[in-house]
Design a protein with these regions (language model features):
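ATP-dependent carboxylate/phosphate-activation module, predominantly the ATP-grasp catalytic core
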Residues: 219-290, 320-351
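Positively charged, low-complexity intrinsically disordered leader regions
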Residues: 1-13
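A short beta-strand motif that forms the metal-chelation/ATP-contact edge
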Residues: 158-162, 218-219, 306, 312-325
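A short, flexible N-terminal coil/short beta segment enriched in small residues
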Residues: 11-48
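A short glycine-rich, hydrophobically flanked beta-strand micro-motif that places a catalytic Asp/Glu
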Residues: 207, 218, 294-311
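Active-site nucleotide/adenylate-binding loops and adjacent lid/helix of ATP-dependent enzymes
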Residues: 50, 76, 124-215, 220-232, ...
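Short N-terminal binding/cap micro-motifs at the start of the first secondary-structure element
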Residues: 32-37, 56-57, 169
């Protein structure tokens, strides 16, 4: 789909920016803290756009936000007066999951006349209902993803049902089934409990469940250097999966608790050195495929959420095409240190790219 807001329009806006006062902007949710923390580490100014009633963390961490803008709802950022105010501050917006969810892809692509760090046309690609979606890019890159089932009756092995939660649209009510009969039983139960709707379930993605060890592989694609960097790994803490599974098996069976996978935190990880070659190859191939299919390609961070099988193969089950939200990496990743001599997270790497682009007068190359 062609965007109504063109690269030329955004370039014209950013060309008018005061390079001494460029400001990193984000909406107050998801990964705003790590974005602003990285910006402050690089001495950049910051603005946090908060929804009234959700501003407390951004007020308490006083170092991070130079300015907090309170709105009745996040989507009010689309109002022309608010956009103009942000342009006056020479604001470059940084996208994360909440940015996409609360503003909406159509609005971001067609109505938000603010420079966004990254490729705004790639945000929609995360959605599995999009025609040229993340599976499409993985296939173009030659990267394995789980087998897809086009209808529930095709399920012939353990499968993951990926469906939106009924009440919290930011969350996904994933669940695992062992067969079509198990799917019917669990689907009916979740609809009756109000966890999902039948409409969302009918649109759900059904994937083969791939056993293995989970790693979220975080990369950064730099238009300034032309390189794809491997910044680090994190894993997710999920309720009620963690730490229910640490109970003795007998107690788990006695409790008969329905397992859910709602992400609530992060934990660091590293990977055996002999697997790093595969990791680098995956990042390079995915970046190349994205550049061919969605020019100008990836700008900044992505995450290939992967399973390493018993055969040491990588299977990518989800892709994040914006700030993935992994603040733990800022203090725990050895891989960023291998590049730069110190640990850092995604937020600081974004800020470094913005500063390099300003110094070389190449801001046009990192925003859309």
């Amino acid at each position: 789909m062609e965007l109504l807001i063109s690269l030329q329009q955004i370039a014209a806006i950013v060309d008018q920016y005061d390079l001494k006062n460029v400001t990193v902007g984000t909406i107050g949710s998801h990964s705003a803290l790590e974005i602003m923390d990285g910006a402050k580490d690089e001495d950049l100014k910051t603005i946090c756009i908060c929804q009234k009633g959700r501003e407390l963390p951004y007020q308490r961490f006083k170092r991070l936000a130079d300015k907090i803008i309170l709105l009745d709802k996040f989507s009010d950022i689309l109002n022309q007066e608010n956009q103009e105010k942000l342009r006056q501050f020479s604001t470059i917006m940084v996208a994360h999951r909440a940015f996409s969810a609360y503003l909406g892809y159509d609005n971001i692509e067609n109505d938000l006349k603010l420079p966004i760090f990254g490729n705004r046309s790639l945000l929609r690609v995360e959605e599995r209902t999009t025609l040229r979606n993340q599976y499409y890019l993985l296939e173009k890159a030659g990267i394995r993803h789980p087998k897809l089932y086009h209808k529930p009756s095709d399920i012939d092995r353990p499968a993951m049902i990926k469906v939106q939660e009924a009440k919290r649209k930011l969350e996904r009510a994933f669940f695992i089934v062992s067969s079509y009969e198990d799917y019917e039983k669990k689907s009916k139960q979740k609809i009756e409990e109000g966890l999902v709707t039948k409409q969302d379930l009918d649109r759900a993605t059904i994937e083969e469940y791939v056993p293995g060890t989970y790693f979220n592989l975080n990369f950064f694609v730099s238009p300034i250097t032309g390189e794809t960097e491997f910044l680090g790994i994190e894993r997710r803490l999920q309720t009620n999966l963690h730490d229910f599974v640490s109970l003795p098996a007998r107690q788990q069976i006695e409790m008969d608790l329905e397992i859910q996978n709602i992400e609530v935190g992060h934990t660091p990880a590293s990977i055996r050195e002999s697997l790093l070659e595969k990791v680098f190859e995956m990042g390079d191939k995915f970046a190349l495929a994205a550049r061919k299919e969605y020019p100008p390609g990836i700008i900044g961070p992505i995450s290939l959420q992967s399973v390493v099988t018993i055969d040491l193969d990588f299977v990518v089950y989800d892709v994040s095409l914006r700030v993935p939200g992994n603040p733990i990496m800022a203090t725990t990743s050895p891989y960023a240190k291998y590049y730069y001599g110190h640990t850092m997270g995604v937020g600081r790497r974004i800020a470094m790219e913005i500063k390099d682009a300003m110094a070389q007068r190449k801001l046009r190359e990192i925003v859309t």
